[in-house]
């Protein structure tokens, strides 16, 4: 959801956005997490490996479109079969189906981990995704739903960047009251 919001802000503010990979599988590999969460991590790692690998092999410009193609199928689409999700995402982007092999390859794990740890090093280990960095200001979040548009997208952006730029600002949170809204 945050990526949709950042897209909206980038379009209205002419931001130069560099998309990176933050892997929940890497983040949680040595942590005690619930069995349900642990069961998802191998599939999550496959997606992260695919995106990181194609960022290396095809180029960084594929990261965001691939992230969107995968994410749209997984989240609002509810698809759970990684093989189908990956094949459909590659087809949507006009990429060779053989590139799916990278989902199961550790060939570019160094790039995946470097991207992951670049983000985590900016905000700390006790966060998740998304991580947003604006110049020297970085933060976890926001966790939002639905993604704001128009002036509200800009208002939220300005407020969050302003709050996060205060050196002593660490956390602002409230409980979620709804499931993600993709429309």
Predicted regions and their residues:
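C-terminal cap of thioredoxin/glutaredoxin-like
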Residues: 6-10, 83-183
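Structural alpha/beta surface segment adjacent to cysteine/selenocysteine redox centers
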Residues: 1-86, 160-163, 171, 180-183
């Amino acid at each position: 959801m945050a990526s949709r919001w950042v897209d909206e802000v980038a379009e209205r503010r002419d931001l130069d956005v560099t998309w990176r990979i933050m892997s929940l599988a890497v983040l949680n590999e040595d942590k005690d997490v619930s069995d349900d969460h642990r069961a998802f991590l191998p599939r999550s790692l496959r997606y992260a490996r695919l995106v990181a690998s194609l960022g290396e092999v095809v180029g960084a410009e594929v990261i965001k479109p691939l992230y969107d193609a995968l994410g749209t199928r997984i989240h609002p689409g509810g698809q759970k079969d990684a093989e189908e999700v990956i094949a459909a995402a590659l087809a949507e982007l006009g990429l060779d189906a053989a590139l799916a092999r990278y989902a199961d390859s550790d060939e570019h794990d160094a790039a995946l981990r470097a991207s992951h740890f670049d983000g985590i090093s900016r905000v700390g280990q006790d966060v998740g995704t998304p991580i947003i960095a604006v110049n020297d200001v970085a933060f976890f979040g926001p966790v939002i739903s639905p993604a704001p548009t128009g002036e509200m997208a800009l208002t939220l952006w300005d407020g969050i960047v302003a709050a996060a730029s205060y050196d002593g600002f660490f956390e602002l949170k409230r409980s979620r009251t709804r499931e993600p809204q993709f429309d």
